[in-house]
Amino acid sequence: MPTINQLVRKPRQLAVIKSKVPALDACPQKRGVCTRVYTTTPKKPNSALRKVAKVRLTNGFEVISYIGGEGHNLQEHSVVLIRGGRVKDLPGVRYHIVRGSLDLQGVKDRKQSRSKYGAKRPKKA
């Protein structure tokens, strides 16, 4: 335990909190251009082909981000909006692409949780 004198000379250091989403630069979302759109497989207990895209952001960062929902219209050079949020079973994927914004369309025929997938309200029959 330090003495009062030692604390006067050198105060206690605050622990630096490291950002989980460094590429966002403390912004809620960032715009970027897809450089590669592909599928990848998840970690051990799970099995699937997860849709991901490598995105070059406006601040120069290049990140891998997840494309949620069923089906998408992304290809190389598509302009997308990314937000934070990792995918637990995909190592290195710390961002999500926002559906229904810029070049990425919303999920078709989505009835529930529509706002998360950029789907418009369905017409009454």
From Swiss-Prot:
GO terms for cellular component: small ribosomal subunit. The modification 3-methylthioaspartic acid is found at residue 89. Keywords: Methylation, Ribonucleoprotein, Ribosomal protein, RNA-binding, rRNA-binding, tRNA-binding. It holds the Pfam family Ribosom_S12_S23. SUPFAM superfamilies: Nucleic acid-binding proteins (SSF50249). One of its GO terms (molecular function) is structural constituent of ribosome. InterPro entries: NA-bd_OB-fold, Ribosomal_uS12, Ribosomal_uS12_bac. The keyword DNA repair does not apply. The keyword Magnesium does not apply. GO terms for biological process: translation. Residues 113-125 have a biased composition (Basic residues). Residues 106-125 are annotated as: Disordered. It comes from the Bacteria. Belongs to the universal ribosomal protein uS12 family. With S4 and S5 plays an important role in translational accuracy. Part of the 30S ribosomal subunit. Contacts proteins S8 and S17. May interact with IF1 in the 30S initiation complex. This is Small ribosomal subunit protein uS12. The lineage of its organism: Bacteria, Pseudomonadati, Pseudomonadota, Betaproteobacteria, Rhodocyclales. The gene is rpsL.
